[in-house]
Amino acid sequence: HGQTSGSPAMDTIYGGVLALSEFIRDDYLQNSSLDRRSAYILYNCIDTERFRPAPPPMALRTRLGFGPRDFVMLFCGRLEPDKGIHKLMEALSKLPVPNIRLLIVGSPFFGRTQQSSFLRKLEQQAKALGDRVQFTGYIPNEDLPDYYRLADLVCVPTLVEEAAGLVA
């Protein structure tokens, strides 16, 4: 992620490349001698057995402190500036509807909950919004479907072009 991998030397080993997005394909081809017709895209797929429509998990909504009339916006991902969470909170601060709540699922480092200077800034920004913002920290992948189901809206405020857009 964020590294260039194409090279004419590697192109002699194989006759094509499979990329997860146009962005990855185009980035690879910038440093490659492969013809564009030899670069295929296979977009990320969704496991429809895990991520399928189902009633929202009311027990989880309640445990997280959301009322029945709350409109829950979900951000799920790594907590870093490029992901645009701070901009999402700015937008939330401009919405005069108190029952719009933001649930932030994720951490600065994949796979573990750990502090970072950016997370501390987000927590400070969230204080100004009172109880409208809630952080869960890292949530294991197998538990994520319930978090998506409890949300009324999923937000992906990324500020840079994503290589694969795993969350969306």
Give the label of every model feature segment:
Residues 18, 58, 67-83, 89-92, ...:
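Conserved donor-binding/catalytic core segment of Leloir-type glycosyltransferases
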Residues 115-142:
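Nucleotide-activated donor-binding/catalytic signature segment of Leloir-type glycosyltransferases, i.e.
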Residues 1-20:
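A conserved, positively charged/aromatic
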Residues 23, 45:
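Carbohydrate-associated surface elements
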Residues 138-139, 146-151:
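Short alpha-helical donor nucleotide-sugar binding micro-motif in glycosyltransferases
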Residues 52-66, 72, 120:
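A short helix/loop element that forms part of the nucleotide-sugar donor recognition site in Leloir-type
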